[in-house]
Amino acid sequence: MPRYKESMFNRVVHDGSKMIIFNSLTGPAGIRYVSESAQKKLDDWEKDNFESIDYDSTVFKDFLKCGFLVPTPCDEKELRDYYITKYMTSPRLHLVVHTTRNCNFRCTYCYMNHKNERISKDAQDGIINYIRKNIHRYMSVHISWFGGEPLMEMGAIEYISKEVIDICSKASRPYTSSVTTNGYYLTPKNIETLLKCKVRNFHLTIDGTKETHDKQRVLIDGSPTFDRIIENLLYIKNDVPTRALAVSIRTNMTKQHESTLSSYYDFYNCLFGDDGRFSLQVKPVADYGGDRVKAIENDLLPNMCCIYDSLSKLNGKIKFYWNMQDLSIGSSVCPSRMHNKYTIGCDGSVHKCDEDVGEIGEKPIGHLYSDGTMKLDEVACAKWCYVRHREQCDNCFFSMNCFMEGCPKVRVYRNENVCDIDFEEVDSLIAWAAKELNVETI
């Protein structure tokens, strides 16, 4: 019996004349170009079922290192189950806290029904008291501030953070925090406060250049927002010395962005390319419901292939780290499947899906009371966290990335378990990642 075999998680992509290998277990770190001589050796090994491998050769060691070859006794499906269980039962408490349903923006594609609703004092106390009562159950705590526009309620962020930081410090548990914001209120004063609250990861959206952004992401009265956001980011770059923070600038792409990709990249590379704390991320504008997106449905991209192909031809210092991480193990898995992840609504309602809060037909899984008691419907929780093995996914190379499931909300609400992976798009991303990461050649 041969000692090694090809991994079931392998993918071979051809970018012109170049052969690229990818493995969804080793992720971006395992991407390699394969030289013609290495291809020939691999072909020869395949012909005799890997009986003639030269175990001392550099080529063999490289294939082994990137995960393309694995020991024959390795049960990779069993290994996948192990990683799924490990992910689902993470000992970290992750709370996504909606500080408000309100927003100062009216983006053309937003699915949310904005309401003048802010997080109640009972909900704030509930978060604090829940963590105080249960901190012994968790190895660490992470709070993601969400909305609406979360920075419209800085007082709530300060109040909760101060108490939770103290609780975690006394219990010797690490505490981390992030915020998803439109960037308009990311002012010098608020930045100072957020850093004191241990917010270190900032996720904000700027839709390309000034021209495209100010068409898609405007204030309630229709006023532009681009210049104000860039001003805030330049303050972080020039006046915030700490290196212990990361700013991810997301751009939601439509067909209108295709012709401006070069100027888009040059603009951000020029401003932030020399500061490693800043990175870019591109995602397609998607139809998550609501009436606004219907007005631009003809501008929605069928997939991101053309965007990835164009960006792969550009060179600069600023990187697309988050897009590269889309190829990492478990990166396509929705956090709602995790046992210890909860989304807290303004009224203390407990959800699994971040997009479910305050929407018509929402299905909370429980409620968080001011004394820290979290009453959960365990039947509802089970629907979100249930690990369902889909036969059609069992042998898929990408199953270490998605853990064999699409959107849990679709499964829970519609009783459908549909694969939403576009494999042509994945191949384009692999080819782009090989260039972006400047990977080695075997």
Where are these regions (language model features)?
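Radical SAM enzyme [4Fe-4S]-AdoMet core and its adjacent flexible, acidic
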Residues: E211-I230, L234-R337, C346-D347, K363
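Conserved alpha-helical substructure of the radical SAM core
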Residues: E78-E192, C197-R200
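N-terminal [4Fe-4S]-dependent radical SAM core
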Residues: E6-Y33, D56-V96
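Iron-sulfur (Fe-S) cluster-binding segments and ferredoxin-like electron-carrier domains
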Residues: C110-D122, I360, M400-A431
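Short Fe-S-cluster ligation motifs
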Residues: Y130-E149, C419-I442
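Short, acidic, Ser/Thr-enriched surface-loop or helix-capping motifs
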Residues: S24, I344-G345
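Local cysteine-cluster metal-coordination motifs and their immediate loop/turn environment
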Residues: N102-M112, K352-E355, R390-K409
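C-terminal accessory region of radical SAM enzymes
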Residues: N298-S328, E355-F403
